[in-house]
Amino acid sequence: MSMIDLAFIIQRPPYKSETSTLGLTHAISYQVVDMFLDDGQGVIPKVCFIGEGVFNCISEHKSMENYGVTSIESHVKNSLLVDLDMYVCKEDIDRFGIPENRLVDAEDMGADKKLQIVPFSEIQNILNNSKHIFIF
Amino acid sequence: MGTLTIAPFASLVGSKSMDFALKLAKTAADKGHKVNIWLTSNGVMIVKANQKHLKDYSHAEKYVKELLEKGVEVCVCEACALARGIHKNEAIEGIKWDAMHWYLAKIYNSDRVIHMGGE
């Protein structure tokens, strides 16, 4: 065995529960998983925002001001910074009227990765190709 | 025999998910499977020792101790626990304290994973 793909599906809106944050923090922890694994072993998380989960990807959160907690936006940015592949369902952002230029971008932090807006069929492919699926 | 990892996110009281997870873990362990339990989010509430068993509420401490005796690995998310005011010195003995990468590593080596989150 070497690397395995894991799909993290985030389908809950931000701040309504702890769920979205947990999905992101679990995915980000892939960076240090090798502490518990043998050489050459690892996991490749793919984070997919679907349904109301796409609201997590809108930029300019004010959670620190309003709730006193780190924003989900910063978790998304940190995820991009550590090269996580992150996908946003095209049909769902269209359904909720979210313009693509309102989505989080971590370019200011020097991230090479960007949120990838993809049709649901591509997210289905990710699910099909993942060893395990985690729904948050 | 296989390896099963279970991650219940719900607390013990207010949902039957945790109760189900613990009983499923016991059944799998009794059949000889290797079982891991990852406790995060409100699931961390069950690690507190000295739980009083009131008949109107589900009870976890007895089950958790039995699972530990059977060799089930139970690990709690330290940050989630501390955020809820639960400290290691008041927890059931034998439970591991670690972070989310522990769960990902167990997932890597599992044949089946039951992730009971998203509530």
Predicted region positions:
Chain A
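Short, glycine-rich nucleotide/cofactor-binding loops
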Residues: 8-25, 57-66
